[in-house]
C-alpha cells in the first residue's frame, strides 16, 4: 500500500447516526403522560372500528403494565422488544381483528404523541444534502423498541428518511448498543471499514465508547443525556448536526495532507 492509499484510508466515507437526541430531539419527557395520550388515540381508533375495548382506564393501565414488564425484562436480557408486536399480541388476545395496515396505523397512534414533541436541527435537510454531496454513505443505528414503520413515518414527515440507505433498529436484533456485534453488522451493511466511519450519538456509554472501541470516529452530539460529562479522548463534540459537514471536511483534509 502506498502513502496516498494510507492517507485515504483514514478519511471518512460514511456516517452512522443514532436517532433520539441526535437526529430527532425529544428532550426530557413525561413518559406516563405521553403513554396516556397514545392510549387515548389508539382506544378511540379501536372504538371507531367497532373493536372490543372495554373501559379506557383498564385498557391504558393493562397495556402500560405489559410494556413496562417487557421493558424491565429487556434491560436484563439486553434485547429490545418490538412494542408494536407486543401491542398486537395483547389486542389479538382481546379479540381485536385488524389487517396489517390497520395494525401499523394502530401502532403509529401510540407513537404519535411522542413524535409531536420531536424537533430537528433547523438545517438538518441542508446538512444531509451537504453530506451526500461529499460522497458519504449515511445510515442509522439506534436502540429502540418503536417499530420501524412508525419511526420511518416520523422521519418522512421531517423529510429526512430517504437520505439513509442503511437503517438498523435494535429490536430487530438479539442485542443492542453498546454490544460490539451490532456495530460490526453496521460496518458490513454500510460497506466501509470501521476507520472510515463516523458515528454520531448522544450517549457516551452506548454510543461514543463502543464506537471508539470498534475503530469508528465518534462524535458526541450535545444533549441533556450528556450534560456536564467529559467527552472521551478520541471523540469530537458538536452542538448541532449542522456542524458535521465542516468537521468532516476538516478531518478529511488533515488525513489527505498527512
At which residue positions do the language-model features occur?
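Asp-based, Mg2+/Mn2+-dependent phosphohydrolase catalytic module
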Residues: 2-15, 48-54, 125, 129-132, ...
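N-terminal helical cap/lid subdomain that shapes the substrate entry/recognition surface
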Residues: 10-134
Amino acid at each position: 500500500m502506498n502513502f496516498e492509499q494510507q492517507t485515504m484510508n483514514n478519511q471518512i466515507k460514511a456516517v452512522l447516526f443514532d436517532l433520539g437526541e441526535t437526529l430527532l430531539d425529544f428532550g426530557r419527557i413525561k413518559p406516563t403522560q405521553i403513554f396516556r395520550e397514545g392510549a387515548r388515540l389508539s382506544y378511540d381508533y379501536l372504538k371507531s372500528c367497532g373493536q372490543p375495548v372495554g373501559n379506557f382506564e383498564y385498557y391504558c393501565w393493562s397495556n402500560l403494565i405489559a410494556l413496562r414488564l417487557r421493558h424491565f425484562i429487556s434491560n436484563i436480557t439486553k434485547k429490545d422488544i418490538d412494542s408494536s408486536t407486543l401491542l398486537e399480541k395483547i389486542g389479538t388476545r382481546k379479540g381485536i381483528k385488524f389487517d396489517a395496515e390497520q395494525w401499523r396505523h394502530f401502532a403509529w397512534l401510540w407513537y404519535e404523541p411522542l413524535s409531536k414533541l420531536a424537533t430537528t436541527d433547523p438545517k438538518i435537510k441542508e446538512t444531509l444534502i451537504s453530506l451526500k454531496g461529499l460522497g458519504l454513505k449515511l445510515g442509522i443505528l439506534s436502540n429502540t423498541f418503536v417499530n420501524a414503520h412508525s419511526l420511518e413515518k416520523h422521519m418522512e414527515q421531517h423529510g429526512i428518511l430517504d437520505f439513509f440507505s442503511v437503517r438498523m433498529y435494535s429490536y430487530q436484533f438479539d442485542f443492542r448498543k453498546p454490544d460490539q456485534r451490532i456495530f460490526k453488522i453496521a460496518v458490513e451493511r454500510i460497506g466501509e471499514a470501521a476507520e472510515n466511519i463516523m458515528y454520531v450519538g448522544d450517549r457516551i456509554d452506548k454510543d461514543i465508547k463502543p464506537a471508539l472501541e470498534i475503530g469508528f470516529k465518534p462524535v458526541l452530539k450535545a444533549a441533556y443525556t450528556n450534560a456536564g460529562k467529559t467527552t472521551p479522548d478520541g471523540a469530537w463534540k458538536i452542538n448541532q448536526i449542522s456542524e458535521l459537514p465542516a468537521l468532516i471536511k476538516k478531518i478529511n483534509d488533515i488525513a489527505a495532507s498527512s
